[in-house]
A protein has these predicted regions:
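Tandem repeat scaffolds
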Residues: 1-223
Length: 223
C-alpha cells in the first residue's frame, strides 16, 4: 500500500545506494552525478537528465531509458548500446520514434538518426542538429528557435507551422520539404541559397498565417 507520507515525486529522487530496485526516477535531474553502486536494473529512467553522468559501473538490464538525455560526457557501461535504448543524445538511433511534444531543448543531437520521426509539437529550441537527416519527419508545429541546423536534411518533411526563428539553416536542404504552410523563418541564418526556391512554393503555403508568430511564411522569408 502506498504511504503518502513517505512518497516523493519521481523527478525529485536522488540516486542513493541502498534504494530497493526497481527505481522510479522519471524526469529526475542526475546530470553530472557518479552513479556507481546504484542498482538500476529495471529502473524507470524516462526523461532523466544523464548529461555528464557516470553510469559505467551500473547494471542497466531492463531499464527504461526512453527520452533520457545524454551527451558526449555521459559514460555508459561497456557493451551497453545506449544509442538504441530510446535515450536522446548525439548519435541516437531514433528513426520513426514517437517524440510528439517532447521537450528536447538545448540537446546535442548531432549524428542522430531521425528519419521518419514524429516530432510534431516538439520543442527543439537551441538544439544542435548539424548534419542530421530528418527525411520524412513530421515537424508540424515544432519549435526550432535558435537551433543549429547546419547541413540538416528536411527532404519530404512536414514543416507546417514550424518555428525556425533565428535558426542557423546554413547548407540545410529544405527544397524537398513536403509542406511548409505557416512555417516562420524570421531571422534565420544561411537561407540566402534557398530563399528563391522557397519563395517559389505554392501561394497557399506561403500565404498561410501563423497565429503564434503572427507572420506568414512569405513575409518571414522576405524580411
Amino acid at each position: 500500500m502506498l504511504d503518502l507520507l513517505q512518497w516523493q515525486p519521481p523527478e525529485d529522487l536522488l540516486p542513493t545506494v541502498g534504494f530497493g530496485a526497481p527505481l522510479d526516477a522519471r524526469g529526475a535531474d542526475w546530470s553530472g552525478r557518479d552513479l556507481a553502486g546504484i542498482d538500476l536494473r529495471g529502473a524507470a529512467l524516462c526523461r532523466v537528465d544523464l548529461r555528464g553522468a557516470d553510469l559505467s559501473a551500473c547494471d542497466l538490464d531492463g531499464a527504461d531509458l526512453r527520452l533520457a538525455r545524454f551527451d558526449v560526457f555521459t559514460r555508459f557501461p561497456e557493451g551497453f548500446d545506449h544509442r538504441s535504448s530510446g535515450a536522446v543524445g548525439p548519435g541516437a538511433k531514433l528513426n520513426g520514434a514517437f517524440l510528439n511534444s517532447a521537450d528536447l531543448r538545448g540537446l546535442d543531437l548531432r549524428s542522430c538518426n531521425l528519419m521518419g520521426a514524429y516530432l510534431s509539437g516538439a520543442d527543439l529550441s537551441g538544439s544542435l542538429l548539424d548534419g542530421v537527416r530528418l527525411v520524412g519527419a513530421d515537424l508540424r508545429h515544432a519549435v526550432l528557435r535558435g537551433a543549429s541546423c547546419v547541413g540538416a536534411s528536411f527532404s519530404c518533411c512536414q514543416l507546417d507551422f514550424a518555428d525556425f526563428r533565428a535558426a542557423d539553416l546554413s547548407s540545410a536542404r529544405l527544397e524537398g520539404a513536403e509542406s511548409l504552410s505557416g512555417a516562420d523563418f524570421s531571422g534565420c541564418l544561411g537561407l540566402d541559397a534557398e530563399r528563391s526556391a522557397l519563395l517559389s512554393r505554392p501561394y497557399k503555403e506561403l500565404d498561410t498565417w501563423n497565429p503564434l508568430t503572427r507572420e506568414t511564411t512569405r513575409t518571414s522569408l522576405e524580411a
